[in-house]
Amino acid sequence: MLKLPPRFFSVYSTLIHILASFLCSSDVRGDFPATRFDLGTLTLSSLKLLGDAHLNNGTIKLTRELSVPTSTAGKALYGKPVKFRHPETKSPASFTTYFSFSVTNLNPSSIGGGLAFVISPDEDYLGSTGGFLGLTEETGSGSGFVAVEFDTLMDVQFKDVNGNHVGLDLNAVVSAAVADLGNVDIDLKSGNAVNSWITYDGSGRVLTVYVSYSNLKPKSPILSVPLDLDRYVSDSMFVGFSGSTQGSTEIHSVDWWSFSSSFEESSESPPPMPNSPPPSSPSSSITPSLSTVRRKTADPSSSCRNKLCKKSPAAVAGVVTAGAFFLALFAGVIIWVYSKKIKYTRKSESLASEIMKSPREFTYKELKLATDCFSSSRVIGNGAFGTVYKGILQDSGEIIAIKRCSHISQGNTEFLSELSLIGTLRHRNLLRLQGYCREKGEILLIYDLMPNGSLDKALYESPTTLPWPHRRKILLGVASALAYLHQECENQIIHRDVKTSNIMLDANFNPKLGDFGLARQTEHDKSPDATAAAGTMGYLAPEYLLTGRATEKTDVFSYGAVVLEVCTGRRPITRPEPEPGLRPGLRSSLVDWVWGLYREGKLLTAVDERLSEFNPEEMSRVMMVGLACSQPDPVTRPTMRSVVQILVGEADVPEVPIAKPSSSMSFSTSELLLTLQDSVSDCNEVLAPISTTSCSSSEHDIFIVGKDRSV
């Protein structure tokens, strides 16, 4: 029996739906499909860039990076118009947008400007610089607009409350409503990534704005404004961002953006129009057109807007007959074409079942040219699964990072795991996978190249000391990424290899967590299966080493190790220099050392001595988070969502016992770590070591068989 693809039934049912709607539908609110997109799916051709706006490694830059203070403006708009008002009912659409942005500065004393989310009727209009934010002209002329501004300079001309506020602008840059961002501890000029959610309820006529450092939406909005949006928009508008500088060196970046809008009917319908049908039943929200058919049949007295319904019964019968014939003919053609396709299509290995939304597929020739035939001079790192090269694409000149998997059998598993996971993930602090190549028996993964390399290189190899604000921003970003993987994805994702060499840094030192080769998906609230433990010593939780079961709390332990490493500038496990003629000494645990200082009331003496400036209270809070995440008992460790809330000041610092708790296992955590590490070191002459993703790291990745499992 021929098995038809699900797509056939989808198309077939859609045609029936269209025919039924054509005959008798009077519901005009469903004429326009929802608009949905995000920055990860947009290309250069799908954006309209004006002025100084440009794309840089997947980030929208509204202003350029200039060392000399200037006044410039830029605007980036989604290239297609979006329906914001129904042409017949004039009712406004509901919409939701989320974006992550930052305001950085080459000269902290040179401030002035800002950016705004804008709804504009004109895709080619760019307003004046300075406080006008590219929204309108100095003369006051310009196209009408609706905008939510984030302003970094107090301008008396525009009645600004201060130089750190959010405001709603309606056809003018004098805000109709404004809120002080200091009330929620947000500083636009800090350089930190700021997240904003803007929603508009078309039925309730209310616009709300939420702002937070965390990627978790706050409970309360900073702005909630009654707004008749239909008074300020036309039927179709353009959405995007506008920004400007005002004699400053500010750089306005949008790292992530998602948008959706629709004309969905609310649960509380507005008063019915004359001669309109009564409010629909609950089922109408699922199948509105069919519900409309039932309503019209049940109520013959209701008027019909469709001209076809006013024709004679014979005309209606003719249309129905023709429609039925067309559907039958369509079904027959599809069945014939699909049967021929099955007969002549060879069975071949495909990644379609593994990857639902694949990134771009590169050719081997492209990558060979990009790396100068994989020249050793292009090598920028060696990982547990292969070598990483710097590449330059010949067609666009774009600089990329190419990961060349070293072992085909092992690399194939790595390839499928990494591609199927990263290909569908969207978060500003996750390393973006541009594409892949699977030719000539090789597997290659293509990523955005991070100008500042990995975090471990920034900590240990850079000639300049990584300042504390950058370190704090990095820790917050990684925590945000892990909270997303653990609690915001459809299936929970356990990374299993969180370490400083897997954290990459972009041009603004924003962190990008990468290397998903060891990651695993599980359903939320479901116990994971035991597997062979894998990862890097010093970052592995003790219970994971014994049971082989990776949970979100094992990632939390790894994150705790990263926190302490970043704060102290020391690796999780270190070995003292051996005395001449003697066997090297045992390695020491960073967690034990920091906990000992905490017990003595000298926690801040553990801080990296290269750090000349930092906030002691802030440093103490972060280090306490590191200790809380490093507790031997996984039950007592916080979740990553809690960690984010603690770091941004939305939750209190957890209580950490003065003395490190004893492990519930038969031996202490440090004893377990040190013994295993020494065992790995002793085998180096027999077994080939597996290096970390950083060339400079002295630790070794391990692959340890779980309890009661054999090699």
UniProtKB/Swiss-Prot annotation:
Protein purpose: Involved in resistance response to the pathogenic oomycetes Phytophthora infestans and Phytophthora capsici.
Segments of this protein annotated with the region Disordered: 265-306
Pro residues compositional bias, start-end: 269-281
Transmembrane stretches, start-end: 316-336
Keyword entries, A-Z: ATP-binding, Cell membrane, Glycoprotein, Kinase, Lectin, Membrane, Nucleotide-binding, Plant defense, Receptor, Serine/threonine-protein kinase, Signal, Transferase, Transmembrane, Transmembrane helix
Residues annotated for ATP binding in this entry: I380, G381, N382, G383, A384, F385, G386, T387, V388, K403
Membrane topology, from the record: Single-pass type I membrane protein
Gene3D superfamilies given in the database record: 2.60.120.200, Phosphorylase Kinase, domain 1, Transferase(Phosphotransferase) domain 1
Extracellular compartment segments: 31-315
Signal peptide: 1-30
GO cellular component, one term: plasma membrane
Main location, first listed in the record: membrane
BP GO terms, sorted: defense response to oomycetes
Molecular function via GO: ATP binding; carbohydrate binding; protein serine kinase activity; protein serine/threonine kinase activity
Enzyme class: transferase
Protein name according to UniProt: L-type lectin-domain containing receptor kinase VIII.2
Glycosylation sites: N57
Coiled-coil annotated residue ranges, if any: none
Keyword presence, Cell membrane: yes
Legume-lectin like as annotated region, ranges: 35-260
GN (gene name): LECRK82
Family named by the database record: In the C-terminal section; belongs to the protein kinase superfamily. Ser/Thr protein kinase family.
